[in-house]
Amino acid sequence: MGDIQSISRRAFVFGSAALAGGIAFGSYSNAESVATSGSGNPLASGLGPNSVTFNPWVEISPEKITLIAQHADIGQGVGSVQPIMIAEEMDLDPGPFEIRFAGPSPAYFNTGFADEFAPFLAADQSPAAEAARAAALESLRKSGLQMTGGSSTVPDTYEKLRIAGAAARETLKAAAAKRSGVPVADIRTQSGHVILPDGTKIPYSNYQRKPRRFRRCRK
């Protein structure tokens, strides 16, 4: 598991640009707020009354956690590697989550082609090369090009899915801190639970929009 601070500046810039307007960072949509959120999150419009979504790749309901695979699996196993990258950053064990393939949406545009479209070697990180990649990325964002191919799945998703998972985890911790009165620095996560200093374990699936309190469980 990583954290947002440990992700490189280039990864952060490219990843956050791919997160449909930054909706993964400290915010969420739910069924009550969809009409006014303007988040651009394709998961927001289909949420149940007690479900939340932090970004286009994470949806949580009282019954399950759903992770979205935006690239089609055409035999290479990318349908598994994408949600596993999110799960690693969210502190989710393999298995206790549902994998769903993404529907059509500009939020899932393929950033992996940005390097290919720029006339520079991949190892070239000069200002000119970075500017060309940024321009290519902006062009891809505007076109909303959502496709699988060219061995682009991991280059496209590795950074932004890590950021999406880490941001969802930190948002859950912040919510637990607000509702428990415990400083967020004293809260940790493990195996799909937020854990308070006294050992109280709060399942991620208990996260709701306006609960009076988290439902808690002990070890």
Give short role names for the model-derived ranges.
Residues 2, 65-85, 95-166, 184-216:
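Short, surface-exposed loop/turn segments at secondary-structure boundaries that line and modulate
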Residues 90-91:
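Catalytic phosphate/nucleotide-handling subdomain of diverse soluble enzymes
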Residues 21-25:
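Hydrophobic h-region of N-terminal signal peptides that target proteins for export
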